[in-house]
């Protein structure tokens, strides 16, 4: 046995929303379950070198949550429609097309397909636990595989273990997988970045503020730093999503601040961002927020986060100084 197949069933889905099955979202419980499996894989150094997922909402989000916790690039997950509502034959075909270089593959999908594939590879019926579920939601099956992903026959695999997220710690180690401190969310959630978007109009600086997701106050783009990106690149990603802007993020931080969330302190690094492109209103996915260009004084007056006020003032002075040198 030279390779390993990791079969992960999606996390617990949310049936409260009236949506088609393909678009059914995860519950928060389902997201945490996926992250616990990811942490377990990281702790045992079982990170996959190839990830393929059903594109159904509950499956791809499960894949992303698990992969991010391991510090891997969620954008590199391969999505394959055949995994959704799949027969064993479909899943075998997906595996047959796996890159030859892949030694450990993570496939994220659904039942009954994953259970059927597990028994096919084991070559026999697998005794069920007391609850009658072989692979319930947010559960991982580890299967040792032969050296070739193609032409897999019954009995070619060996089921090594089945890990349920429900059996793992409810909290997450911080700041690394071997730490004893436990927190409510994965470690990377507490490392965040933000940008203050600006432009020069008629020789004067203007700053772009957006409304918070619940439209209660004015903010600048901020979010969890993606583990595989730099703080600046993560902040640029948030700016595109939350404010509908693209531009150049400065290499030097304007400062940082901390705030309480998820039972601990989150640290936020703040960067200047020169806006080069404003996404048209009808193409901006979060246009419900609203956005507005403001003078430095207006931005300082409106911004909710007190720690950002001196940073806006600092950036305005920096821009004025640059102007005077020209």
What residues fall within each predicted segment?
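NUDIX/MutT-family hydrolases
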Residues: 141-144, 161-167, 270, 280-314
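Domain-level recognition of soluble alpha/beta enzyme cores
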Residues: 122-158
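A short coil-to-beta-strand element that immediately follows conserved catalytic motifs
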Residues: 72-79, 245-255
